[in-house]
């Protein structure tokens, strides 16, 4: 069966393609900022899960009987949650703040059918950002901007972003933006993939 990915994320598409999951992608056009404003004092995993559901819901309602996958990732550093950078200058500010600290990356996924959640999860990866010099930050952004403008942590781990870190704990797929192993198990359990 072909699932619907309620996202245009290149990383999520690439993971599903590489794993052999038949899918089509549709945008959900959810106003993430307005949803986040209402989620005061909520953990990173909870925020990512709410956003994943919000992205999947309109697509699920528009595709009766189909399995819809929503996903979201959220970065927290020192208890502060970060959005995608809005400019190169904002990206540099994020990287300066991240320098020498532990980043928590929450990646959530939800499966919906007919507007109802049939499965959801959120996984955590911990990434230790090395101390970044101002020169490195500018050189990094010279090479990676605007490609990282759509990335909450201002990095693509599969590219130059790997140089930001000293240590990573957690699934590589979680760092890429989707708890893929758990998702594959759920798709098999729901009959969307052969077991």
From Swiss-Prot:
InterPro entries: ITPase-like_fam, Maf-like
Compartmental location: Cytoplasm
This protein's GO CC annotations: cytoplasm
Superkingdom to which the source organism belongs: Bacteria
Catalyses which reaction(s): a ribonucleoside 5'-triphosphate + H2O = a ribonucleoside 5'-phosphate + diphosphate + H(+); a 2'-deoxyribonucleoside 5'-triphosphate + H2O = a 2'-deoxyribonucleoside 5'-phosphate + diphosphate + H(+)
GO biological process assignments: nucleotide metabolic process
Enzyme Commission number, as recorded: 3.6.1.9
Keywords in alphabetical order: Cytoplasm, Hydrolase, Nucleotide metabolism
Cofactor: a divalent metal cation
First and last residue of the signal peptide: none
Active site location: 72
GO MF annotation: an example: nucleoside triphosphate diphosphatase activity
Pfam families: Maf
Biological function: Nucleoside triphosphate pyrophosphatase. May have a dual role in cell division arrest and in preventing the incorporation of modified nucleotides into cellular nucleic acids.
UniProt family annotation: Belongs to the Maf family.
Protein name: Nucleoside triphosphate pyrophosphatase
């Amino acid at each position: 069966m072909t699932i619907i990915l309620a996202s245009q994320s290149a990383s999520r598409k690439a993971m599903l393609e590489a794993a052999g999951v038949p899918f089509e992608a549709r945008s959900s056009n959810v106003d993430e900022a307005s949803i986040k404003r209402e989620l005061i004092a909520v953990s990173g995993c909870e925020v990512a899960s709410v956003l994943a559901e919000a992205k999947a819901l309109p697509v699920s309602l528009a595709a009766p009987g189909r399995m819809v996958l929503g996903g979201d990732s959220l970065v927290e550093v020192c208890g502060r949650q970060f959005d995608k950078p809005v400019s190169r200058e904002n990206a540099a500010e994020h990287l300066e703040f991240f320098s020498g600290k532990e980043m928590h990356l929450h990646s959530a996924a939800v499966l919906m059918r007919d507007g109802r959640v049939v499965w959801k999860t959120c996984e955590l990866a911990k990434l230790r950002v090395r101390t970044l010099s101002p020169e490195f930050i500018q050189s990094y952004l010279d090479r990676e901007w605007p490609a990282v403008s759509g990335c909450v942590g201002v990095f693509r781990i599969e590219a130059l972003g790997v140089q930001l870190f000293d240590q990573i704990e957690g699934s590589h797929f979680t760092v890429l933006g989707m708890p893929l192993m758990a998702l594959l198990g759920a798709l098999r359990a729901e009959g969307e993939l052969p077991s």
